[in-house]
Amino acid sequence: MPDDSRISPLDQARILSEALPHMQRYDEETIVIKYGGHAMGSENVARQFASDIVLLEQTAINPVVVHGGGPQIAAMLQRLGIKSEFAAGLRITDAATIEIVEMVLAGSINKQLVGYINEAGGKAVGLCGKDGNMVTAAKATRMLADPDSNIEKVVDLGFVGEPEKVDLTLLNQLIGHELIPVLAPLATSKGGQTFNVNADIFAGAVAGALKAKRLLLLTDVPGVLDKSKKLIPELSISDARKLIADGTISGGMIPKVETCIYALEQGVSGVVIIDGKTPHAVLLELFTNQGTGTLIHK
């Protein structure tokens, strides 16, 4: 983004004029934003993101932030000499690892982001899915093909969960009252066991329960790419499923798109996958005519 000092007053006025109808469209609407771990790697980017979230709240939008923390968890595990293992894109989380995951997500990252938002003039409240039994999860399982026999088998992911229920009681006490919920993707089972939940999946479940106007997934890529690696600006659910089937959408993008589809089917109006490293990515998507990333809709 260009330095504000290089933008003439007239251009600044035009920018604000372009933003107005978009602000009106999202007036008093809930926007769920998933902020990824890699995009959080720079303090400057994190502070800029926090400032943008405060701007949303100041324009009568109700932002709900869900953050990840994969790189930070990996760094802490490495420091403690614990090996990181993954299966089907999910971190295998044993008893020792879940304690570290909870410490990093609900402690370090969550409170740091809350601090940045508060320093920018907002009123952030740091929570995780365990608070108020907000998110109840069941143990996640995945099927993977054995590399030798090619026979599929169930992989034990440990304390990794998938949301079963979202209780909005606590969130509804915050949303619309000038408070910004900042959620760490941890959940609890009916028996009280803590589960690590993939942040995209967690955000999709929360957005679906809230019937959010938008779910924004901030990632490390510009959005969904075609086979020529060009950005696809817009997709319907049926388009997305076809691209998964023909291999255009592959690897780590598949669970993200599946989360988008789930959220849409639960009542979210639109989901956008955008590059979280782009300066002011959230504002570009919500407040400009062109937007950014890939919009997925029904």
UniProtKB/Swiss-Prot annotation:
- Name the major location: cytoplasm
The site annotation (Transition state stabilizer) covers K34, K256
What reaction is this protein's catalytic activity? N-acetyl-L-glutamate + ATP = N-acetyl-L-glutamyl 5-phosphate + ADP
State the EC number(s).
Answer: 2.7.2.8
| One Gene Ontology cellular component | cytoplasm
Write down the Pfam families for this protein, in alphabetical order: AA_kinase
> Which biological process annotations from GO are given for this protein?
arginine biosynthetic process via ornithine; L-arginine biosynthetic process
* Listed NCBIfam families: argB
The role this protein plays is:
Catalyzes the ATP-dependent phosphorylation of N-acetyl-L-glutamate.
- Name of the protein in its database record: Acetylglutamate kinase
Question: Highest lineage ranks of the organism?
Answer: Bacteria, Pseudomonadati, Pseudomonadota, Alphaproteobacteria, Hyphomicrobiales
